[in-house]
Amino acid sequence: MNIYNKLRAREHGYGNERTYDFALRRLSVAKEDSWRGIAPANYCPDFNPEPPIFSAKFANCDGYRHILAIANEDGKITLQDTTQRNHQPEEQSLVGPQCHFNAVFDLEWAPGQMRFVSASGDHTARLWEVAGSGIRGLNSYVGHTRSVKSAAFKRTDPAVFATGGRDGAILIWDIRANLNMDLTSRVDNCIYSGHTGGPGTPVSQRKQRTRTPKMAGGTTSSSITGLAFQDNDTLISCGAGDGVIKVWDLRRNYTAYKKEPLPRHKLPYAGSSTFRGFTNLIVDASGTRLYANCMDNTIYCYNLASYSQRPLACYKGLLNSTFYIKSCLSPDGKYLLSGSSDERAYIWNLDHAEEPLVALAGHTVEVTCVAWGSSHDCPIVTCSDDARHKIWRIGPDLDGLSEAERAEKYRGTASYVREFGKKAFGPSSGNHKYNLRDLESTPRSLKRLMDQNERTPGSVEKTTTKRSFLEMLGVAGQETEATEQPQKRAKPLESRGRRLFGPSSQETACRHIQLQSINEEDASPSKRQKENSAAEDVSPLHKLLSTPSHSPLSENVNHVYTSPPTTSAAAAAVAADALNPPPISAAIYSPTSNLPNYVLDGEAPHLGIMSPKRKAKEKVDWLTNIRKQKLMSGRAHVTLSEKISEEQQADVLASPRLQSLRQSECSPRIHASPRRRISHTDGGGGTPAGSSSHSHSQSQPKTPTSSRRNSETTLLRFFSIQRSSSVPAEETTTTNAAPSSSDPHPPAVTAPAATPLSMRTPTTAVGSD
């Protein structure tokens, strides 16, 4: 009831608003009102003999508000008249048609008509009409790429409804719209990616034909778990992972949005838990209050008049561990009913949000969906995963019945959770806490219960499992219990991090010496100042060395340290106190106190073998590295080619005439040019000049160096060859002229002396002048 109705009621004399909390205590399930859900389907290969019920809602039409529609996991939907009772000795199952070929997650009645829409896991939503005693399908709406999770009609328009699915899309449908070219229903408005981010369903990146456009890579789509219309132009939605409730203005065309659509208002998650997903949304009759079931075991109430991000109330006490738990309001809007994962359903008085008013116990597993009828007896329906649904009615008081009679006649009873005298109207209602015995009737988590027990004086005392260090000493700690009280552990003086091993006995004694208090009765203030200055002159190292360790592991150490002589009486007193260790309760012992102290002894066996130090890396640039590599390569062993190059360099240093003579006598490449020259001057037979030059060009490629050498020595080689060839030519002429032409056996021609040219080119004929 809103504030306006309250003011009008006060004007008419009805100032005191009365409730019926006492009547809810008498809710019970008679044996005739316990049903076994819908009969299972036989078509599915995964046969489930007890399919759970996912949705149950009463009709929203006058004269038929006692009709209940329920849908199960097999895709079956059936109608039940809640005024009829089951008079059979056993629980009976209802018979319903096969409406979908997958689970039906939600259904919603049209306002003022006997029509309802169903949302299924087969990616479709279907419109049904009640005809006689059965249902008839009117149309199928295909637009989602994943399971359709929720559906909602406009508050006063039975022709427009909205659907939300696991693909993150919210589709607005108008049953009066024309069909598409493929005779499918046309979407009136689309809100794609309404709830993105969080642990939602990842989007597939493979290419496929879908009606829902894909989002950018790396983003996730949060499933649409709840839809509710505030009015005909305002739609409210919630997601499974983003933790935000969004308010959409349907007068905008969200279909034309290419980027993420922007809602008109946002209501972020108001808690501090990581379970921030919402499972269900309901709006009261006035349209000013929004109730949202959250995964953090809380139902949040928001003010829709101002869209404040801070909730008005937080209804606690349930256990919400799945996305199938739903809630509803009473017909008068004064009470809130919700399912729970602890096998119960809970009813809250909206004026007291701290804890539930009544708990309905009768199911054996999680209670998922609930419904509150508006007929004359206001029945309550609870559905569970045990494939049972129970109808709760207000009956007689059961306190006078025995346990056997109650178990025989009833299948569910209600019990108070909140105490009226202390909780509802008491001044200290906010300080009420639970004890361990209340765990059976209160769905509190164990952690929350233990936190409450810490702050409750009369509750079970919490015992710590931690032991102090003195308790772990065992016998040594027990000896001191009789003489003195256990003291708290002293705060360490050093400000650095904690040490892995405790301090040695010497260091403990030194610390105890520093913490020794000075008795004011022993000396005057001036004398105490002198003694303090003298005590400061004694270094802590000398104090430590004055009390050597008596560990058996350090007996082989021959070093004996003695403290330097002091003339001060205060220093001697300090040294005497160091020899007397403090009592066990005041000192802190360590398991390593008797081990050798290599720092004080000055020697350690592991320090003799030290790994060599690494040479520091020299910082040299890349140019210097290249220069060093060239120098190192020059110092390597000399190869045969390098020796030949050194000999050529030695020849260059000789005189030009000596170089020409060496080249003319030894180089075979230089004699190739006179062959070409002789062949040009020779008019007789022999190898043609063209073929000789061609073969030479193939065997000896012409380079700038070789051409330069040939040009420099051409003249010198020409005269040297002419000189060597002129003398043998004269001898051959005189020899050939001696025999006659008639001699049948002419003497053999004696070959001239072999020259380098004739030896290298035996096929070349030397012409005579």
UniProtKB/Swiss-Prot annotation:
GO biological process, alphabetically ordered: mitotic G2 DNA damage checkpoint signaling; proteasome-mediated ubiquitin-dependent protein catabolic process; protein ubiquitination
Intrachain disulfide bonds: none
Keywords: Cell cycle, Cytoplasm, Phosphoprotein, Repeat, Stress response, Ubl conjugation pathway, WD repeat
Bias (Polar residues) ranges: 503-518, 546-562, 657-666, 705-714, 758-769
SMART domains to which the protein is assigned, alphabetical: WD40 (SM00320)
Statement: the UniProt record of this protein carries the keyword Cell cycle: yes
Pathway: Protein modification; protein ubiquitination
Cellular component GO terms, alphabetical: cytoplasm; nucleus
One of the record's GO molecular function terms: protein-macromolecule adaptor activity
Compositional bias (Basic and acidic residues): 524-533
Induction: By heat shock.
Tissue: Ubiquitously expressed during embryogenesis with no sign of tissue specificity in expression up to stage 17.
Region (Disordered): 196-221, 448-467, 476-562, 655-769
Matches recorded under InterPro entries: G-protein_beta_WD-40_rep, WD-repeat_CDT2_adapter, WD40/YVTN_repeat-like_dom_sf, WD40_repeat_CS, WD40_repeat_dom_sf, WD40_rpt
Ranges that cross the membrane: none
Major location (coarse): cytoplasm
Positions bearing Phosphothreonine: T201, T456
Subunit note: Component of the DCX(DTL) E3 ubiquitin ligase complex, at least composed of Cul-4, pic/DDB1, l(2)dtl/CDT2 and Roc1a.
Main function: Substrate-specific adapter of a DCX (DDB1-CUL4-X-box) E3 ubiquitin-protein ligase complex required for cell cycle control. The DCX(DTL) complex, also named CRL4(CDT2) complex, mediates the polyubiquitination and subsequent degradation of E2f during S phase. E2f degradation is necessary to ensure proper development. Substrates require their interaction with PCNA for their polyubiquitination: substrates interact with PCNA via their PIP-box, leading to recruit the DCX(DTL) complex.
Matching PANTHER family: DENTICLELESS PROTEIN HOMOLOG, LETHAL 2 DENTICLELESS PROTEIN RETINOIC ACID-REGULATED NUCLEAR MATRIX-ASSOCIATED PROTEIN
The protein's name in its UniProt record: Protein lethal(2)denticleless
Organism: Drosophila melanogaster
Annotated gene: l(2)dtl
